[in-house]
């Protein structure tokens, strides 16, 4: 499958860009590998910082970042990629990033699915509240299909939130 997490980034970036372009057809949508640079420095270096007034506080290292440029503002989208099963620690990492920057979309994906603890927490015990990072916004968790190069919709948590 993937020998390294980094190998997931190009197909994930292409998929995420397609999804966001479908949702914002008139906006400029780009996806970036931001895994090795702080998001604050990245936005400033790309000249996108003016779209995000709080960008200086974004000292976070998200694997894939999408920028949706609207007329005078912008939206962020995050995807964290995991080669192994998604753990509670992984969820916590993305939850922290999302609470800092408040992206419009925040997704964590892995071709290996989720750990048993995550499955129990979210599916068996229905604790979807732990995914919330802002009012009306919560993380999405999904299995990445490496052959189709997109998420597997039946695995999406919370179910039905593919919007």
Q: Which residue stretches match the model-derived regions?
A:
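Intrinsically disordered, low-complexity terminal regions enriched in charged/polar residues
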Residues: 3, 10-14, 126-163
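Short, charged/polar micro-motifs that form catalytic or ligand-binding hotspots
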Residues: 2, 80-87
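Alpha-helix termini
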Residues: 19-25, 68-72, 126-133
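Nucleic-acid nuclease catalytic cores
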Residues: 85-90, 99-137, 141-146
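Nuclease catalytic cores
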Residues: 1-28
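Active-site metal-binding core of divalent-cation-utilizing nuclease and nuclease-like domains
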Residues: 26-75, 86, 149-161
């Amino acid at each position: 499958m993937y020998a390294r997490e980094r190998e997931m980034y190009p197909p994930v970036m292409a998929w995420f860009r397609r999804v966001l372009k479908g949702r914002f057809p008139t906006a400029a949508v780009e996806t970036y590998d931001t895994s090795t640079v702080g998001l604050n420095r990245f936005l400033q270096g790309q000249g996108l910082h003016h779209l995000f007034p709080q960008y200086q506080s974004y000292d976070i290292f998200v694997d894939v970042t999408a920028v949706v440029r609207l007329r005078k503002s912008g939206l962020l989208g995050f995807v964290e990629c995991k080669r192994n099963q998604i753990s509670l620690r992984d969820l916590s990492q993305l939850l922290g990033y999302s609470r800092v920057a408040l992206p419009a979309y925040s997704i964590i994906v892995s071709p290996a699915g989720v750990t048993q603890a995550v499955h129990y927490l979210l599916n068996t015990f229905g604790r979807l509240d732990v995914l919330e990072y802002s009012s009306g916004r919560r993380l999405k968790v999904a299995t990445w299909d490496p052959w189709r190069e997109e998420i597997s919709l039946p695995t999406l948590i919370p179910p039905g939130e593919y919007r």
